Regions:
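Short Pro-Gly-centered flexible turn/kink motifs
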Residues: 107-109, 120, 293-312, 754-760
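C-terminal beta-sandwich/jelly-roll accessory domains of carbohydrate-active enzymes
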Residues: 683-764
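Polysaccharide-binding surfaces and accessory modules of carbohydrate-active proteins
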Residues: 3-10, 15-20, 29-31, 40-273, ...
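Active-site neighborhood of glycoside hydrolase catalytic domains
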Residues: 409-410, 442-604, 614-619, 623, ...
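Aromatic-lined carbohydrate-binding/catalytic grooves of carbohydrate-active enzymes
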Residues: 338-479, 492, 503
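Conserved, mostly hydrophobic/aromatic
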Residues: 175, 298, 347, 418, ...
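Glycine-rich, aromatic-flanked loop segments that form ligand/cofactor-binding clefts
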Residues: 82-128, 250-266, 309-337, 374-381, ...
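Carbohydrate-binding surface patches
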Residues: 27-30, 242-243, 656-699
Length: 764
């Protein structure tokens, strides 16, 4: 049962104490806060439920640091918003100014509300006709919530801090700052924090660039500050999805791990910081440019949610994010009366034809798509204005008469043809961008973000950024998209964003506009989806340049990378799934050699890699032999058998000792069955490859492990040096307990590098 309790006591030094304990038993998660006197709260526990919650009141005496020589009279024990007034000597985490002068605030708590908020929906899942089925439960969602009101009366700044323990076990905190005085209050940065244990001594983040997103990097969590920030209007490739700390060597299946994420699609920072005097903190927030957000008397600014996830290993950390995102989307469907549906198999035309659109080619491609089992046909860039290449036309969201003339070979005719084949129709847009060589820019040069009236920011891909904070520009973009969605019967929008947003100043106000621009993007997403119930939108940003809980709450999927080379995708997919559930990660079967790397790979490898995401095709099937089309159809048919379970499954990754291999899986919620993928990226040091562990199963159950029933002919994939048959690679498989599979595992087949095989695990 969901629990929140408040306790009162007195510290050994006479300080009055208040403690709040919150628990979500079903999620095996809890947190505890202690308020020393009227100070802001400290996290004193974040992890598994406690057996004696009333003892959290004692944590002040148990954990508060002593005063030490050569320092202040009080040794810092960081609150949720560390400031110098509480002896924090680290980086500035609360940057506000009045009349250009920085304020050093000391907040005094005036009210603490700790309650279970009964709001939102809860769901029950049952199996119907072999697939998961959801229904809305009668009881509302129960969320333990702490709301703290605090104020610096002299400085005329009020703080309202809210913390929730979600049913998934995620902890969400945000702060609202209100100007209670005269004169404009400028907001620079409000970086909230979670305290972490002393043995959380290693940091894991991701970095990357175009075509190589979310590459993991580790380092010791030493004294000092480590930060990953993005100041180009989106999270971008180098920003980290999560900042995770844990016991040295933590992995997907082991180690206490504490992760933080800023749920925001604009400028932000995630950081880990440790001082010589006190415990470490992780946290983050939005970063604002000078003059960007200013509050007049009575006005407020609210930070994005800072979200924390605890787990025994990264798999559990990720599962909490997946559960949260899935519920948000389930709520949207229920609230708007939209029936849920399986993730349709997509064909996107980009790597098939690029800008070379014509009716005959794309209708023929649609025919091949139908043969391959495709259910959604998406026309990519090149259908509008003067958009014959990437140097012109962006912003002119009218159908090009040069490419799609009115008549029986128009874009409307193509949409009708696609719909007539039983497919959904999708179309590419890049609403936030404009080419200087466009009618929109020529007619409205003031509709772009730029630092001065006479100078544009540096171009990227021959593009500038539309000022969506300008109501006229917003109305034009929204109106053009709304009109086309209605006229063409568009079921799906691929929304792209291909320029780093720099020198982001609105001509309308003369002030930086990153914050307002991000809110405008959220608004146009929700406006379009509300106006066209059932419309789905994919978030793409030069591939995976904008992936965060902000955009994930309103987009229906993300494009993980412009690189569909399956060798590169193996880790891109793996680390994207730390935040994003598989059914929301666009994974496409591309050509061989891959367009982005020129690496040749087998069709089996490409299909097996795409199998664990929102499966699609980005490949000119008109040039492929019928044998390949038939094989593709077999794989899409197999994917359709499992995709509804993938959308509720627990995603697991194994910590393979061999750096040359990857083991990934999707386990049913009741652990009755699972599908795993073994990928041999390069040659292994051992020959054959060592046994691999299969995490996530019921340790006490017996399972049958066998190959998945698709074209995984080892005779075509083996190394060919006379190896013997693999004992369990038969239709009958082998029976083992879940504990055995997780402890010492199973021997994978000997296959060439850049190959992958799938196998199923079924409880008997």
């Amino acid at each position: 049962m969901t629990l929140i309790q408040t306790f009162h006591g007195t510290a050994s030094n006479g300080t009055p104490l208040t403690a709040v304990y919150a628990e979500q038993p079903a999620a095996a998660a809890a947190f505890a806060l202690v308020f020393p006197g009227s100070d802001l709260p400290r996290f004193v526990h974040w992890g598994r439920p406690l057996t004696a919650p009333e003892t959290v009141i004692n944590t002040f005496d148990a954990l508060a640091p002593q005063r030490v020589s050569g320092a202040l009279d009080y040794t810092a024990w960081p609150s949720v918003l560390p400031t110098q007034s509480e002896a924090w000597s680290g980086s500035d985490r609360f940057d506000v100014r009045r009349d250009g002068v920085e304020l050093f605030c000391k907040f005094q708590v005036t009210a603490i509300e700790a309650e279970t908020v009964a709001a939102g929906k809860t769901y029950t899942m049952a199996e119907k006709d072999g697939y998961p089925s959801w229904s809305v439960a009668s009881e509302p969602k129960q969320t333990p919530t702490v709301t703290v009101t605090a104020e610096d009366v002299e400085q005329c700044v009020k703080l309202t801090w809210t913390c929730e323990l979600d049913e998934t076990g995620l902890i969400r905190q945000h702060a609202e700052v209100t100007n209670t005085g005269e004169g404009r209050l400028e907001i620079g940065k409000i970086e909230l924090a979670f305290t972490v244990p002393a043995d959380a001594n290693e940091i894991l983040t991701t970095t990357g660039h175009h075509l190589r997103e979310r590459s993991p990097q580790r380092q010791d969590f030493t004294i000092g500050r480590f930060a990953k920030s993005s100041m180009i209007g989106r999270p971008d490739f180098d920003a980290t999805l999560l900042l995770s700390v844990g016991e040295h060597g933590f992995g997907f299946t082991h180690g206490n791990v504490y992760s933080a994420h800023v749920a925001w699609s604009g400028n932000s920072v995630l950081s880990a910081e440790r001082l010589p005097y006190t415990t470490g903190v992780i946290g983050g927030g939005e970063v604002l440019f000078g003059g960007e957000v200013g509050l007049e008397h009575g006005e407020s600014y609210t930070t994005p949610w800072l979200v924390g996830s605890y787990g025994e290993g990264l798999n559990e950390v990720a599962s909490r994010f997946h559960g949260y995102i899935r519920r948000v989307h389930r709520d949207w469907l229920v609230d708007h009366g939209i029936a849920p549906k399986p993730r349709p198999v997509i064909l996107n035309t980009w790597e098939a034809v690029y800008f070379n659109h014509d009716y005959d080619t794309l209708t023929a491609l649609a025919d091949k798509a139908v043969e391959s089992g495709v259910e959604r046909f998406v026309v990519d860039d090149g259908w509008f204005g003067a958009r014959r290449d990437d140097t012109a036309g962006l912003g002119d969201w009218q159908i090009s008469q040069d490419v799609w003339p009115d008549g029986d070979k128009s874009l409307k005719a193509l949409a009708d043809y696609v719909h007539g084949k039983g497919l959904e129709f999708g179309l590419w847009f890049e609403p936030e961008m404009v080419n200087p060589d466009s009618d929109m820019f020529r007619n409205h040069p003031d509709w772009v973000l730029k630092p001065t009236a006479g100078r544009l920011p540096m171009q990227g891909r021959t593009q500038q950024v539309v000022d969506l904070t300008n109501p006229d520009a917003y109305d034009y973009i929204y109106g053009a998209m709304d009109k086309l969605v209605g006229e063409l019967g568009i079921d799906y929008i691929k929304w792209d964003h291909n320029k780093l947003v720099t020198e982001e100043v609105s001509p309308l106000t003369g002030r930086p506009a990153a914050h307002a621009q991000t809110l405008a993007v959220y608004r146009i997403f929700t406006d379009l989806k509300a106006a066209h119930p059932g419309l789905e939108i994919e978030s793409c940003s030069s591939g995976g340049g904008r992936i965060d809980l902000g955009i994930l709450s309103i987009a229906d999927r993300v494009w993980a990378s412009d690189c569909v080379d399956p060798v590169e995708r193996a880790d891109i997919q793996r680390y994207t799934s730390l935040l994003v559930p598989p059914e929301m990660i666009g994974e496409h079967v591309g050509a061989s050699p891959a367009h982005s790397t020129h690496r040749a790979t087998s069709q089996e490898m490409r299909m097996a890699t795409a199998f664990f995401g929102h499966m699609g095709i980005e490949w000119n099937l008109l040039k492929e032999p019928q044998e390949d089309i038939d094989k593709l159809a077999e794989w899409t048919a197999e994917f359709k058998k499992h995709r509804e379970w993938f959308a509720v499954d627990t995603v697991v990754h194994s910590d393979a000792a061999d750096p040359a291999v990857r083991v990934d899986g999707c386990v049913m919620p009741n652990k009755a069955a699972a599908i795993y993928r073994f990928t041999q990226l390069t040659t292994s040091q051992t020959y054959p490859a060592a046994p691999v562990k299969l995490p996530g199963l019921d340790p006490d159950a017996v399972y049958e492990v066998s190959p998945l029933d698709v074209s995984l002919d080892l005779a075509k994939q083996d190394i060919g040096n006379g190896q013997s048959p693999l004992g369990w690679w038969t239709a009958d498989g082998v029976k083992m307990t879940g504990r055995a599979l997780a402890t010492y595992g199973i021997r994978p087949p000997a296959i060439h590098p850049a190959q992958a095989v799938l196998f199923k695990v079924v409880r008997v």
